Amino acid sequence: MTASSLRIASRRSQLAMVQTEWVRDELANAHPGLEISIEAMATQGDKILDVALAKIGDKGLFTKELEAQMLVNRADIAVHSLKDLPTNLPEGLMLGCITEREDPADALVMHAKNKDLTLATLPEGAVVGTSSLRRLAQLRYHYPHLTFKDVRGNVITRLEKLDSGQFDCLILAAAGLGRLGLGDRIHELIDPSISLHAVGQGALGIECRDGDAAVLEQIKVLEHRPTSLRCLAERAFLRTLEGGCQVPIGVNTRFEGDELVLTGMVASLDGKQLIRDELRAPQDQAEDLGNRLAELLRSQGAGEILAKIFAEARPEA
């Protein structure tokens, strides 16, 4: 990189490219004359589509290949959906900035035959498609009469599977649908009382080399402080629980006056156990808030739930 150039690593999926091109355009507007290039590539999570995400492994499924490009100086930044970025990054890399969050809610997308129904009124045995253990566990807890099936592929592929009749509905991130111009497919936004969203959902995280002052100066225009505070608390919560992106851990954050309020949840995969609580703290104590809520849930049994999940997921020797 020179002071007048910036190389961006991105996944090559349609949604990833939309997000990366938005970052490129915002940086180009902020820095006239900056030469920006995008290197798109497939990650492990993109390549393995016939296995549930949780069975592949967890650390960096959608990020490792992008990070490798930065570590060998073939890219200067990587653009991630923040929910896919592990809380512990490889040595030499850092989370440079977090963009303003879109709606972090989970969204219900219905098959046309169910257009007059809601998630709450779907009949027994209706087939719900989701690749997220977090969504699966929470929905099993609230709607044990429904049937859940794994669905993989990019957003367009998943919608095609829904429309072909393989599912009665899908649960997807509202932000991703919106960024793809598919907001009209959202049948309802799932209330946080039913489904807490993933850590970082709806925000983009821009990763860079640790201490790269020139790059940090270039990307700081995209930093959104309120989103950063919320996500700092969420990521601390996840890190302290020693959870990853593919475990049933959910969060919700909101501001009330000068305080940040964090709600957190851990559930068993069968949906029979769900531990949920909430804490608040001054905004400048966001990370400590996440740590404290994680310890509170641990004291209520969350550690045992997660230990069982990790033990069952561990491959046989």
UniProtKB/Swiss-Prot annotation:
According to UniProt, the reaction catalysed is: 4 porphobilinogen + H2O = hydroxymethylbilane + 4 NH4(+)
Keyword check for Transferase? yes
Residue positions where S-(dipyrrolylmethanemethyl)cysteine is found in the record: 245
Pfam families from the xrefs? Porphobil_deam (PF01379), Porphobil_deamC (PF03900)
Q: Which cofactor does it need?
A: dipyrromethane
Pathway(s) annotated for this protein in UniProt: Porphyrin-containing compound metabolism; protoporphyrin-IX biosynthesis; coproporphyrinogen-III from 5-aminolevulinate: step 2/4; Porphyrin-containing compound metabolism; chlorophyll biosynthesis
Family membership: Belongs to the HMBS family.
Protein name as it appears in the record: Porphobilinogen deaminase
Q: Which organism is it from?
A: Synechococcus sp. (strain RCC307)
- Lineage of this protein's species? Bacteria, Bacillati, Cyanobacteriota, Cyanophyceae, Synechococcales
